[in-house]
């Protein structure tokens, strides 16, 4: 939904917790903080080593020039950082520095940093102002929007977390220029997901421009599909903030994906790669139930545009299924899947047998 506040922005309508996703330079962050009523003072900047090399220094300089005193914490990159130990590093550093409830937490990085720093903000002093500064495509179109924050547990992914909305999101399109191609194409998996579950027009745009979009060669088209994808996420979240109903459709592909990430070991697949594989499995199940309404070959062609570097077939299905049984979305011991009724319409079901899931996994792993 277009924001009433800016031409290149998306508004997330959550009553008193509403905020805007700005598609603008990180140089605008000091003024954006002022716009939402965050007066210059102390702020805690959380980022990772990869992102820090490119964006930490200029961001701190801009904040300092605007009167902010910045404490920065640079963490290792990768999914392993979404852990209790790294969370406590943030706690220890923040409390030793002497934060108060007016100290904003700035999450500069991809989905891992956003989830981790967001959960720290949600729990430190029972809540600090949170500002999401996503630098990866996956974070810009998905992880930074909607208020989900979490860390992983040995039992599964994102099992310890909270819903906690940011004060604002600033997604700088230029940060995608320094993103490794694998991370970029992985992020496109979430764009494709948003198109499949809610936006046939976005899916058609991806179909029509699949090669330049996946190759990151047309900035105008890429910017357009990103903004449309964020609009899908914002609309769904605005209608169901805490995933009590409709928001669950955003988990299309994620039941398989989260299990795959856990069983294969975090880092073997990027989150986007796992989601792409999970969407192929979900597409198989959807077509099985709605063969006329869900054109499997057409939709699969776009999903397959996401390159997969590791072989999911090496993950034994019994291990995968056991991991799915521990998924946080399950209810009453039933594994819940998001399926497509048709392009642009999705629903949640627990009516998937183990045999059906096995066949879907075999399809997802096929060439």
Swiss-Prot record:
**Protein name stated in the entry:** 3-dehydroquinate synthase
Cofactor(s) required for function per UniProt: Co(2+); Zn(2+); NAD(+)
- Pfam families named in the record: DHQ_synthase, DHQS_C
Task of the protein:
Catalyzes the conversion of 3-deoxy-D-arabino-heptulosonate 7-phosphate (DAHP) to dehydroquinate (DHQ).
Where, by residue number, does Zn(2+) bind? 190, 254, 271
Family assignment from sequence similarity: Belongs to the sugar phosphate cyclases superfamily. Dehydroquinate synthase family.
Q: Looking at the keywords, is Repeat present? A: no
According to the record, cofactor stoichiometry and binding are noted as: Binds 1 divalent metal cation per subunit. Can use either Co(2+) or Zn(2+).
Task: State the UniProt keywords alphabetically.
Answer: Amino-acid biosynthesis, Aromatic amino acid biosynthesis, Cobalt, Cytoplasm, Lyase, Metal-binding, NAD, Nucleotide-binding, Zinc
- In which pathway is this protein known to take part? Metabolic intermediate biosynthesis; chorismate biosynthesis; chorismate from D-erythrose 4-phosphate and phosphoenolpyruvate: step 2/7
User: What species is this protein from?
Assistant: Salinibacter ruber (strain DSM 13855 / M31)
Its Gene Ontology molecular function terms?
Answer: 3-dehydroquinate synthase activity; metal ion binding; nucleotide binding
Q: What class of enzyme is it?
A: lyase
Taken from the UniProt entry, a GO cellular component term is:
cytoplasm
The Gene Ontology biological process terms listed for this entry are: amino acid biosynthetic process; aromatic amino acid family biosynthetic process; chorismate biosynthetic process
Cellular compartment(s): Cytoplasm
EC id: 4.2.3.4
User: What catalytic activity does the UniProt entry give for this protein?
Assistant: 7-phospho-2-dehydro-3-deoxy-D-arabino-heptonate = 3-dehydroquinate + phosphate
């Amino acid at each position: 939904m277009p924001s009433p506040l800016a031409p290149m922005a998306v508004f997330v309508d959550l009553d008193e917790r509403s905020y805007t996703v700005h598609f603008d330079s990180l140089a605008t962050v000091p003024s954006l903080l002022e716009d939402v009523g965050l007066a210059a003072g102390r702020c805690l900047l959380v980022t990772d080593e990869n992102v820090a090399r490119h964006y930490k220094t200029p961001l701190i300089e801009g904040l300092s020039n605007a009167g902010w005193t910045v404490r920065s914490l640079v963490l290792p990159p990768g999914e392993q950082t979404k852990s209790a130990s790294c969370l406590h590093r943030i706690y220890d550093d923040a409390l030793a520095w002497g934060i108060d409830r007016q100290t904003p937490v700035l999450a500069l990085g991809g989905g891992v940093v956003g989830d981790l720093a967001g959960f720290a903000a949600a729990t430190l002093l029972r809540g600090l102002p949170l500002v999401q500064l996503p630098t990866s495509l996956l974070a810009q179109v998905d992880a930074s929007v909607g208020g989900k924050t979490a860390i992983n547990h040995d039992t599964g992914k994102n099992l310890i977390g909270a819903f906690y909305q940011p004060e604002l999101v600033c997604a700088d399109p230029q940060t995608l220029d320094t993103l490794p191609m694998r991370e970029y194409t992985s992020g496109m998996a979430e764009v494709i997901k948003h198109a499949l579950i809610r936006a046939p027009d976005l899916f058609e745009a991806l179909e029509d421009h699949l090669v330049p979009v996946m190759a990151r060669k047309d900035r105008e088209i890429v910017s357009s599909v990103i903004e449309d994808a964020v609009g899908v996420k914002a609309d769904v979240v605005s209608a169901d903030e805490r995933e009590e109903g409709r928001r669950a459709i955003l988990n299309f592909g994620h039941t398989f994906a989260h299990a795959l990430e856990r069983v294969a070991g975090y880092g073997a697949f990027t989150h986007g790669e796992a989601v792409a594989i999970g969407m192929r499995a979900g597409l198989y199940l959807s077509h099985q139930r709605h063969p006329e309404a869900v054109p499997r070959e057409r939709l699969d062609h776009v999903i397959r545009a996401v390159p997969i570097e590791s072989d999911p077939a090496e993950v034994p299905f019994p291990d995968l299924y056991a991991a799915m049984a521990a998924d946080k979305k399950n209810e009453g011991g039933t594994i819940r899947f998001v399926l497509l009724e048709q392009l642009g319409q999705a629903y949640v079901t627990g009516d998937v047998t183990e045999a059906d899931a096995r066949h879907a996994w075999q399809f997802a792993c096929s060439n």
